[in-house]
Amino acid sequence: MLLYLMMVFLAEYNYPSHFKIDQRISAEIIIEQTNKISGDPHFYMAIAWVESRVKSGRVSHTGDYGLFQINYNFWGKKWGYKDRNKFLKDMSNPYHAVIAATIVINEMKRYKACDGLHLAACYNGGPNWKNSKNKDKILKYSNKVNCLAKAYKRKYPKWKK
């Protein structure tokens, strides 16, 4: 119980005040795990916020699942998932979700079109996002993620260890 109360206190101190307890717990795990893999927790948290509001159990109309809205038809099947419910459960678990998002991000980093600020665009629209009919929406998404990551970095510098 004491550990739980400490976690809630730390969450209040370290996260936006509008985060609910389940969001704070997921955020804590995302930040911790992202630091373990030498990722940018501000960027990951920005993606998680834009994609799912850091809420588990989310499913989009396009078949994207969990905290980072990982696409089942592409990534889930590629990773051998046969059951959408199992995929949703795993992508809603922040430990699994960070690994999945890292795989997607690392795959996108292989492409020149995904350099720098365009990494968020690639996360959303794939490496050929520039040729997409949704290019404007993808750029808007990318700008939102990058601005939020920058704001998180400014407001929560201690997220990065």
Region spans (language model):
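Sec-dependent N-terminal signal peptides
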Residues: M1-L10
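Catalytic glycan-binding domains that act on GlcNAc-containing polysaccharides
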Residues: F9-K161
